[in-house]
Amino acid sequence: MDGFEFFSGRSDVVAMICDDRLLDLSESIPSGKVPEPIELDSPRGLDILRHSCAHVLAQAVQSIYGDAKLGIGPFTENGFYYDFSVNEPFSSDSLRVIEDKMREIVHSDQKFVRKVVDRQSAHSQFRDEPFKLEIINATDDTLSIYYNIDADSGSVRWMDFCRGPHLPSTRFIGDAFALTHVSSVYWRGNSDNPQMQRVYGTAWGSAKDLKGYLDRVELAKLVDHRKLGKELDLFSLPDEIGPGLALFHVKGGIIRSEMEQYARLRHLEEGYNFVYSPHITKRDLFERSGHLQWYGQSMFPPMRLDKDSCSQGFDYYLKPMNCPFHSLVFSSQPRSYRQLPLRLAEFGTVYRYEQSGAIHGLARVRGLTQDDAHIYATRESFEDEVSKALQFTISLLGDYGLDQFYIEISTRDASGKFLGSDEDWAYATHILQKVAQDSGLQTRDDPGGAAFYGPKISVQAKDAIGRYWQMSTIQLDFNLPERFGLFYTDRAGERKRPIMVHRALFGSFERFFAVLTEHYAGAFPPWLSPEQVVALPVTSAHIPYLEEFVSRFSSRLIRARVDYMQDRLPKKIRSYVKEKIPFVLVAGDRDLTNRTVAIRFRDGTQISDLPIQKCFDGICASIDRKKQIQTRIDFDSVLE
């Protein structure tokens, strides 16, 4: 019996799970097994829908551009893409033509039919597809080809080398898809390889869901941190410095300083000790840590120095990570179990040679400052430390205004290319899963997503427009304690290897800056705002009154000033609304008499005749409590 028979009458089922394997409905069900259905509107169903849509995209491209060569075409979080080698770049007009062809293919109801083939047959059928041949040659698993079969004639209309699974036919894709944009990429992300055209698309289970997504995309353009960074004078990425190297301006520097100061304070409260390490080091350190072997392609090339003291000199590298330095701090003296857990933190700047095509504003840069920490724990305290690190993560992100999360648990696959024993991996994975479940947050599995040196937890945070960002990682490391010979003395006087945990709660300050800028659409909460209070006199006669009042904020380190410009008051107000100032104060004759001010908020609401003491208390409370204030209602809530 196959899946079609088993789920007959279920038009919403598009694939199945059997023995933890995703299968097409055409696959035979092993005797005695009961498959689970995958509905089209489920997360896995949408993944399959998008994967099948990628195949239709490739079929459409090759039917229009006969010389196009196929790369890869996976599904993504909200859509899909496919890479093509073509003679001329695609244009927006090209995408419209391709999308029309896709709809024609979808409506023709071609069947997706999978066939397992041997290597010789795969080579023969893809002899004119050099990139597919490369994939075939690198594949050790079962080789399978998907054929698109004409509904009327039964002839093969198109084929792709693919693991699957796929929808039963193109008809299941429906009309809720769209091609969104195109970019240039290198094959396999390597600049030594040919350049290709990557066509992106999105696909959903309904037209309503598609519209909702496209609306969010348009909203995302409005809050793009690169756009807002320029408009609000926060940062720039000058060509004179180089790709992925950010320059924070005065206002952006204030925001970043506030971010760092508060994070540092919270780390100290949580028992972390801050250390500092240099930006460069000799080659030997990264050979010892394994970074040159495992991470060398993402490191900047070496600098040959010290030829005056050694004829050959030494290779120095910009550091891509802080962890080897922290392990040297640990090993700098004998350690006892009484000193553990040892929590070493550093806001350390690292340098990674990201491909120029992967660089994206502050979200993906070459020079980044991590809120990095490494915890060295005993086996007995490991679970408690991971739990504390996760709780600290959720609490700290919440203080910055992110409060919706899910957790991804990355485990190893069956490749065997991992450090540490099976027992260690099983133990560590069990602990991470237990801590994640105990947190009460939704969890998702990421099989095969672990690094070679240990499993990890990733905290995914939801922003104001519904996007999830990978924020924090808590990563176990079986590698560095072994490579650096780290030991501590236990109660019995025996030497034991510590368990090492990497964790970065923001990922990097640059990326977190980008996330917060988009989350708040540039209207940062008052405690982060570069300018917090601006006072506008109706006439010059009201300046001394406002100067006296504004001076009170200085004692609380609140960024407040009086506007002395001669422009009309409405024009000034419009200007500060555009600059997203949280508190704009206005004072006229009646305010001088009554010791009041008018306070205006970002949404245009205001409070008139507000006693200055009440105004002062409300602004101070808003900043002290790290509350977002956009409206009069928000302000009233802190006064209660």
From Swiss-Prot:
Positions with a binding annotation for Zn(2+): 323, 374, 502
Quaternary structure and interacting proteins, as annotated: Homodimer.
Species of the source: Tropheryma whipplei (strain TW08/27) (Whipple's bacillus)
Protein name: Threonine--tRNA ligase
EC number: 6.1.1.3
Necessary cofactors: Zn(2+)
Cofactor note: Binds 1 zinc ion per subunit.
Family listed: Belongs to the class-II aminoacyl-tRNA synthetase family.
Protein origin, superkingdom: Bacteria
GO BP annotations listed: threonyl-tRNA aminoacylation
CDD domains per the UniProt record, alphabetical: ThrRS_anticodon (cd00860), ThrRS_core (cd00771)
Subcellular localization(s) per the UniProt record: Cytoplasm
SUPFAM superfamilies assigned to the protein according to its UniProt record, in alphabetical order: Class II aaRS ABD-related, Class II aaRS and biotin synthetases, ThrRS/AlaRS common domain
GO MF terms, alphabetically ordered: ATP binding; metal ion binding; threonine-tRNA ligase activity; tRNA binding
Keywords assigned by UniProt, alphabetized: Aminoacyl-tRNA synthetase, ATP-binding, Cytoplasm, Ligase, Metal-binding, Nucleotide-binding, Protein biosynthesis, RNA-binding, tRNA-binding, Zinc
